[in-house]
């Protein structure tokens, strides 16, 4: 009887193994069934940045104006500007002493360190829009080990969140100018020392930023003189819904609402599936399965793959979502998802606003 049982178990093992193709790798499946998600970027002034974790169906909301600078927590010493509030930075020529820099000496440079003025020359004052950090270009140069090699920069603090009424279906994300600062960043052990002051001041403040490797970045609010929590831990978010400074080829920097970044610094890859007419993009999304995934298509060095490509604010029927495309996402834990957008505006009227209001996109997603 024992021999018969062993034989049956061995046979069952062969049958179960024969169901796995030698050319197929096992697919990690996220611990969630997927969902339809309404995101609150906060309405037509889009005050929020929303950090979303697909595998946990969780989100964290922060205000765009809560921070100005992000300090890379890996081995490189790089500093990133808050593009959601239209920040920019320009090196002050021949300046190594921040306290010696006067406002009068910066009059000419202030006319150049601007965002969204349709000047291709202003691209050097913003960071690599693809977000390919730490390797990508940053307006504030890499922080050197020798203090004297670190320049002083003119910092355009960007724009406040707009405070006023906005017509239904429109967006207005830029408020009053937030002013200017001068800044110099040097190393402090394995972290950063930030020297900063208003342009009219002859003495500066200092903050030490210690790297926390559980996160992509440490974030700093210069206006509040302190570190702040913004992004969740590096493996705890996949997508960010935000206002974003991008580049239009030949026209310089430009600011987009309804933008979606993926967490490429944290290891999230994305590619777009665009379905040619007359085939249905919705049907293609519904039919897409794990065996359709093409690993070679995932892009890990550009966080603008979704970007603003999912919506058309000047469509035939007004504000539209493109129904001919969807996105395949691989998170840092190796989980795969398919995702498509279904609405650009608010679906119903409630305490947060009227139906048709911008800043409330809807998407659906499923694990693969």
Which role does the model predict for each range below?
Residues 2-8:
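Sec-dependent signal peptide recognition
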Residues 11-12:
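Repetitive helical segments and hydrophobic/amphipathic motifs
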Residues 1-2, 22:
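Short, intrinsically disordered low-complexity segments
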Residues 15-18:
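C-terminal motif of bacterial Sec signal peptides marking the signal peptidase cleavage site
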Residues 20-368:
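Surface-exposed, beta-sheet-biased, low-hydrophobicity segments with strongly acidic/polar composition
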């Amino acid at each position: 009887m024992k021999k018969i049982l062993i034989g049956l178990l061995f046979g069952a093992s062969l049958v179960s193994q024969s169901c796995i193709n030698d050319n197929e790798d096992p697919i990690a499946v996220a611990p969630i069934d997927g969902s339809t998600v309404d995101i609150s970027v906060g309405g037509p002034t889009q005050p929020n940045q929303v950090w979303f974790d697909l595998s946990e169906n969780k989100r964290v909301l922060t205000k765009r104006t809560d921070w100005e600078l992000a300090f890379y927590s890996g081995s490189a010493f790089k500093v990133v500007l808050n593009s959601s509030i239209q920040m920019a930075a320009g090196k002050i020529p021949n300046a190594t002493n921040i306290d010696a820099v006067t406002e009068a000496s910066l009059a000419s440079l202030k006319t150049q360190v601007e965002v969204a003025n349709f000047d291709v020359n202003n691209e050097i004052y913003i960071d690599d829009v693809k977000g390919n950090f730490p390797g990508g270009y940053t307006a504030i140069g890499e922080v050197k080990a020798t203090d004297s090699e670190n320049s002083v920069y003119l910092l355009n603090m960007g724009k406040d969140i707009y405070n006023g009424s906005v017509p239904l279906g429109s967006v207005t994300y830029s408020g009053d100018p937030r002013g200017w600062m001068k800044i110099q960043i040097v190393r402090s052990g394995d972290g950063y020392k930030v020297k900063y002051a208003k342009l009219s001041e002859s003495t500066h403040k200092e903050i030490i930023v210690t790297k926390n490797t559980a996160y992509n970045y440490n974030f700093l609010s210069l206006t509040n003189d302190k570190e702040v929590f913004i992004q969740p831990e590096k493996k705890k978010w996949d997508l960010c819904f935000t206002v974003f400074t991008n580049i239009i080829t030949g026209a310089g920097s430009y600011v987009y609402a309804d933008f979606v970044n993926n967490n490429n610094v944290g290891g999230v890859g994305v590619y777009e599936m665009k379905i040619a007419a007359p085939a249905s993009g919705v049907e293609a999304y519904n039919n897409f399965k794990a065996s359709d995934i093409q690993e070679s298509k995932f892009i890990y060095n550009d966080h603008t793959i979704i970007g603003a490509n999912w919506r058309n604010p000047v469509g035939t029927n007004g504000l539209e979502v493109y129904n001919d495309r969807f996105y395949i996402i691989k998170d840092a834990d190796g989980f795969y998802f398919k995702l498509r957008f279904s609405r650009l505006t608010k679906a119903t009227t409630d305490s947060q606003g009227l139906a048709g209001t911008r800043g409330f996109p809807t998407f659906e997603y499923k694990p693969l």
